[in-house]
Amino acid sequence: MVEASSYLSHTRFKESLFTNLLSSINHRIVIIDTAPSWGEVSRNILMYVDYVIVPVVTDYLGFSGCDQIMTYVDEFKASMLGECKAEVLGIAITRSHPRTKLAQTIKAGLCERWSDLLFKRIIEESVSIQEAPAFQQNIFEYRKGHTRGAKMYDLLCREIMHRIVARQKGRQSDY
């Protein structure tokens, strides 16, 4: 990412570079996981995508980061004068410890500010979610997907797909 940011900082038409490069991908859905920074790479990605999903860990930094991302996306879109089509599809609560007071407080704060964007499916912290990266596997590969973590992410993916279809049909998701 650092090398890409450095290269992009010296490139003309840098906001459309990723769009040009990625337009040849023949898939209906492409997931791009970016670092929570606001460099050239993030701006390029925002120019390419239709939707942004904001993952939020239920702690102070997660809530603060969500607020910053929401503000940044709005400000970037405004600065691009209609050229950026990205919109926030939703906010996904991840790695939550739902019985803790802090997680409950953060969830309440998210509901208060962005209730219409919160996904209903919450990803609770689990051993499998912690262990999968250590074995260089995603949650669906780890233990052949037979984990609570994989089931939670599967339900979240279904909710995301339902919301995308609803948005494309011009209506709110009732999922």
Locations of regions flagged by a protein language model:
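Cytosolic-facing regulatory segments adjacent to core modules
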Residues: 1-38
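Short, flexible helix/strand-to-coil boundary loops that buttress conserved ligand/catalytic motifs
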Residues: 5-6, 42, 133
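Flexible, glycine- and charge-enriched loops at secondary-structure boundaries
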Residues: 8-12, 59-62, 146
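Conserved NTP-handling cores and scaffolds of large molecular machines
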Residues: 16-17, 73, 77, 164
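Charged catalytic carboxylate motif
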Residues: 17, 68, 152-155
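Conserved catalytic-core segment of NTP-binding enzymes
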Residues: 24-120
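C-terminal lobe/tail of nucleotide-utilizing enzymes
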Residues: 78-175
